[in-house]
């Protein structure tokens, strides 16, 4: 199983719709204002995805218990904005700007960008399995004792693509994976 390079990622994005919308290079400046951005787009051996303007931030307003088998949205506040302030020692969910369609013989691993990690923000995204498609739900933990800012429409994590030596017997789509074709921020369910 080998990691895939920029030429392969570009070809799959353009010809197969693997990533939509697709930025063909690293974007570091806002195209209209010239303002510095947390980079996104194609890199040497990966693709830096962006975070959308949709966020769900954890709150304790209703004194809720977080239970992955019986999750309630009472624990979350929905925000649509160009920035999201994550409270100290708290957590937010978001979604990617990009829609992904993963080929049958490919598995991805997604790693948070170092710019955020160096600020105490930990980004977690589970692997994109063979034939999974959808917008990516992104988990962001603020491990600091201070509020932390996340910028919408800028880079948040890097996706690495690994091609298997052979196609899998059963894909995520064939297993009818529960997060297949997710459109927005998807909360946990069993």
From Swiss-Prot:
Q: Superkingdom, according to UniProt?
A: Bacteria
Gene3D superfamilies per record:
2.70.40.10
MF-aspect GO terms: dCTP deaminase activity; nucleotide binding
Q: Which residues form the active site?
A: 139
**Catalytic activity annotation:** dCTP + H2O + H(+) = dUTP + NH4(+)
UniProt cross-references to InterPro entries, sorted A to Z: dCTP_deaminase, dUTPase-like_sf, dUTPase_trimeric
Keyword DNA damage recorded = no
Question: For dCTP, which residues are the binding ones?
Answer: 113-118, 158, 172, 181-182
EC numbers listed for it are: 3.5.4.13
Gene Ontology BP terms = dUMP biosynthetic process; dUTP biosynthetic process; nucleobase-containing small molecule interconversion
Q: In which pathway does it act?
A: Pyrimidine metabolism; dUMP biosynthesis; dUMP from dCTP (dUTP route): step 1/2
Q: Which Pfam family, any one, appears in the UniProt record?
A: DCD
Q: Which UniProt keywords apply?
A: Hydrolase, Nucleotide metabolism, Nucleotide-binding
Task: Please give the family membership noted in the entry.
Answer: Belongs to the dCTP deaminase family.
What function does the entry list?
Answer: Catalyzes the deamination of dCTP to dUTP.
Q: How does it assemble?
A: Homotrimer.
Return the protein name.
Answer: dCTP deaminase
Which organism is the protein's source?
A: Chlamydia trachomatis serovar L2 (strain ATCC VR-902B / DSM 19102 / 434/Bu)
């Amino acid at each position: 199983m080998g990691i895939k390079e920029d030429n392969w990622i570009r070809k799959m994005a353009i010809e197969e719709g693997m990533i939509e919308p697709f930025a063909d290079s690293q974007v570091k400046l806002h195209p209209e204002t010239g303002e510095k951005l947390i980079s996104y787009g194609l890199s040497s051996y990966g693709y830096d995805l962006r975070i959308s303007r949709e966020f769900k931030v954890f709150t304790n307003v209703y004194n809720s218990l977080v239970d992955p088998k019986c999750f309630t949205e009472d624990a979350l506040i929905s925000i649509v904005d160009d920035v999201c302030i994550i409270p100290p020692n708290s957590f937010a969910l978001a979604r990617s700007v990009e829609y992904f369609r993963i080929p049958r013989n490919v598995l991805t691993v997604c790693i948070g960008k170092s710019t955020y990690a160096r600020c105490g923000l930990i980004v977690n995204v589970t692997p994109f399995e063979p034939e999974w498609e959808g917008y990516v739900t992104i988990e962001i933990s603020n491990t600091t004792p201070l509020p932390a800012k996340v910028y919408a429409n800028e880079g948040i994590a890097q996706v690495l693509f690994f091609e298997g030596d052979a196609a899998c017997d059963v894909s995520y789509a064939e297993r009818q994976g529960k997060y297949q074709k997710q459109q927005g921020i998807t909360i946990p369910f069993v």
